[in-house]
Amino acid sequence: MILMNKILKYLFLMISKVFSFAIFSVIFLLLFLQFETLNLQSLNPIIKTNYVEKHLKRTDFDINYINLKFDKNSNELIFTIDSAFKNKINASEWMLFIRSELKINVLLNILEKKIFTFTVSSIEKKEDEAISDFNFYGSLNSLKNTNMIEIKGSAKDLPLIFVKDLWPENLGKGARAWTNRSLFEGIISNLEFDSEFVLKKNGELLYEPVINLDFNFNDINTYYLKGMPPMTDTLGTGHLDFNKFRINLIDGRINLDDGTRIYINNGKFNAFDIKQRHGPGQILIDASSNVGDFFNLLSKHDYISKLVKLNRDNLFGESKLKLQFDFPLKNSVKFSETKTNINLEVGELKIYNKNKNVSIIGDSALLILDYDINEARFFKGSIKTKSIKILELPVFAQILDVSIPGLSNISDGGRDITFGTSNFDVELSNQGINIFDGILKPESNLPVVGNSLGLSISGKYFFDEKLIDFNGTVVPVSWLNNLPSNVPILGELFSGSKDGEGLIGIKFRIYSENGDEVKIETNPLSVLTPGFLQRIFD
């Protein structure tokens, strides 16, 4: 409502100036009745001082022609102004030559409803930078108990800098600041405007005004988060009404410094209540790229880079990313003020080790993370995979070597071990990653099919200290392990309280202290021990 009041105040200020100008002109007309038309070019300095220099500080403005005419047939005073607007800093960026015409009915009768009408239209010029399609018109109508203002218009091929330059400083300060800070270059290819204000005779709004502004845009560079590379080559639509503002991004891309690209398939910006100070805002991004490029992008952000420690060269797989940011609409927004959701889906994932050899292959992986400062100062979420095949992972091989000799040959080119599915609940902060109840289930419950193996793991990895501390259970021969679980009452005693525990299970610990090498320990008392006794020896 505050923004709307400013708009109306600005509108009424302009109307009052028009009427003041009209009264002055009528007096001028009465003094010189012998003329049918008057040249008012001498008013040019007054108009520039009282309007242009106050409200359009980034624009050069010149009046080429001012004329006043009284039409006896229609009883109208007709003001005609030919003027030129140019970008003050760089006139080659845009020019607008317009003809404005204001018709004031000076002899209203009971049948006459229109108090005044106006039109603003572009004049075609040879200059390449000149805007050639700009047309607005409106009227003030007197009804029985109310007055109604109607304003309509359309425009094509407006440079974004034109919108910035002609945006009054005191009108919609927050939106204006965000536009100046976040949007650059590009074209408003098509714009349609329609509005209606119904006022009481005392000038107060009778009810909520109707405002609809629809536009198409292309090639606008958009900075969505501080420090991140912008979206470019954009194509989309926008809508503004009395309550909300939204932008739909149809296409775009993010160019990374190594020459790779992230393709934006769909995006949205929503300001759900523009009347509310610091009202709710939302950004949605739907993108596709190589998973390594996504991590490369996230590493550009000052805060997120502290959480994302994976090198893009370690990851490969075509992926789809969905990002959601909810935040207050104000001039400066801290990351801690946002609610963030990350949904990353990867197909045919490959993870490489430091020797550039394929270490892990997966049919698919899904990462879901949420960040809410009101709940905690870290990301919470889960990682899910399907058909993960471990080819070469030294730490895992050492666990198997200590626990189950004969299965550890995955570290030297032997048979791989495949897990059918996995699920990890995780917390991610700038200190490290915490895994809760990580479960890797076997591909087959038949021990004769491949290396059938289950595993559970929990623990934490500290980024800066490079310290790890994980505990887990290796459960071989899942088919045999699951037999007791089918026995009523006794099933839980023998199979354990968690997925991944069973009649036969080997407890292990992976840890490091003071930056030393990683150590692996197993609990020999947990081997061939029922699940409820395994928990005793933890």
Predicted features by range, described:
Residues 47, 57-64, 92-105, 123-138, ...:
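Amphipathic hydrophobic-ligand
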Residues 2-35, 200-202, 298-302, 310, ...:
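Extended terminal
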Residues 2-9, 49, 53-54, 60, ...:
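Secondary-structure transition motifs
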Residues 81-88, 121-123, 194-198, 216-223, ...:
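Generic short beta-strand segments
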